[in-house]
Regions:
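Short, conserved beta-strand segments within well-ordered enzyme catalytic domains
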Residues: 5-7, 26, 181-183, 210-212
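Short, solvent-exposed beta-strand edge segments and adjacent coil->beta transition regions
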Residues: 22-24, 175-179, 234-235
Length: 235
């Protein structure tokens, strides 16, 4: 009953700081994703980049992308924010400030225990089965009740606490790449093409820098679609 909406757009500290050796970047939550990406390129002299690339990166804030586990053009798990979050700092509902590094706290017996002075707060772990498709809905779960605390926070939309800073992983920026626009006969052909790539790269789709699908509904909003597609069945 009731509640409050908190804006973190003014939380611009700490400053963005890139560690080239560890391929990580410290960031506040109140900067846009585009500002983060540009600063990473600047501090690394174009050698590193932050791969998560949603179409709203000019408007999306770093904290928001973590809260909803935003994803972009990169296929597979590495295209989602969760894959790159190495450390989080957040304020719990009881006012406690905690900093958690990935791998430090793994749930046991289907729950986490947070100590508040002498009080033990038990946080249950969702155990519902997640579908084998791209999915960013709800808190992260595992059928065996064992997950990393960082994964519980990423994508939970702030229900467990308020993010104030983070440490994100970076990737080496490709020096050479080839851009292709492939026109396929229909949606079934597109699925078959994806399956071919999945097998060719031995399930490691991160070897592809970006992969985007333009389906029938999307084409209705495209300019000059007749230049790209011969008929209404092509994708």
């Amino acid at each position: 009953q009731g509640g409050a909406v908190l804006s973190t757009s003014l939380l611009t500290s700490p400053n963005i700081e890139v560690d080239i050796k560890s391929k990580e970047v410290i960031s506040s939550v109140g900067v846009t994703l585009e500002a983060l990406r540009n600063e990473v390129l600047k501090q690394s002299n174009g050698k590193l980049f932050y791969p998560v690339d949603p179409t709203s990166r000019h408007d999306a804030y770093v904290g928001g992308t973590i809260s909803c586990n935003a994803s972009g053009f990169i296929p597979g798990e590495s295209g989602a924010t969760r894959f790159w979050v190495n450390e989080i700092e957040l304020i719990l509902p009881n006012g406690n400030l905690i900093k958690v590094r990935r791998g430090e706290h793994i749930s046991s017996d289907t729950h986490f225990i947070i100590l508040d002075n002498e009080l033990e707060i038990k946080v249950p772990i969702p155990k519902y089965k997640r579908p084998d498709i791209k999915n960013a809905s709800g808190p992260f779960s595992n059928h065996n009740g064992s997950i990393d605390f960082v994964d519980l926070i990423v994508g939970s939309e702030g229900i467990f606490g308020m993010l104030i800073s983070c440490k994100l992983g970076l990737s080496k920026k490709p020096s050479n790449y080839l851009e292709l626009f492939l026109c396929l006969e229909n949606e079934d052909s597109a699925i078959n093409f994806h399956d071919f790539l999945y097998k060719y790269y031995k399930k490691d789709m991160s070897q592809i820098s970006a992969l985007e699908y333009f389906g029938y509904n999307c084409q209705n909003y495209m300019k000059h679609k007749d230049f790209l597609f011969k008929n209404k069945d092509e994708v």
